[in-house]
Amino acid sequence: MTFRTLRRRRFPAALALTAVLLIVPAASHAGAAAPGAGYSEVPRKVCPIDWRDGTFHVKKLIRCAAARWTVPGGASKALAIANRESNFHPRAYNSYSGAAGIYQHLRHYWPGRARAYGFRGWSAFNARANIMVTMRMVHRGGWGPWGG
């Protein structure tokens, strides 16, 4: 296969992914702050750090969440894993496995995890949701393959 053929095949997929990424973040906040939300809802006042301000702020959010939910290995382990999984890029995506976000949640598990840990309807590409869900999961079950 030539480079030109590969480029022609990947362009429509890249265009579609770009369109989805532009639409999803706007819609991903819809159910997050609804009044009367369930007990698992994470209030915005918990680690009120705007991750969109760059990698420094993503790391700061990870440190805050790791301290809030006391994860095994603390913030240093949480940072090392995020660095390995996505290099702290909220939009990281593995097209082979479908893993997305800072901590690379598989797309078919993300909706259930997000719902269970207070981020119903949020995108895995939202760093706040991805980090908070991960820290709560790790607090409950430790680091390791989650498998569902």
Where on the chain are the PLM-derived regions?
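Export/targeting segments at the very N-terminus of extracytoplasmic proteins
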Residues: 31-88
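Secretory-pathway/luminal and periplasmic proteins that interact with or process carbohydrate-rich
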Residues: 86-93, 143-145
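Functional surface patches built around histidine and acidic residues
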Residues: 69, 90-92, 139
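A short, structured beta-strand-centered segment in the mid-to-C-terminal lobe
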Residues: 119-129
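Substrate-binding/active-site groove segments that recognize
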Residues: 96-116
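N-terminal prepro-regions of secreted/extracellular proteins
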Residues: 1-49
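Stable alpha-helical elements in mature extracytoplasmic
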Residues: 58-65, 74-78, 102, 106-109, ...
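Catalytic cores of secreted/periplasmic lytic hydrolases that degrade extracellular macromolecules
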Residues: 41, 145-148
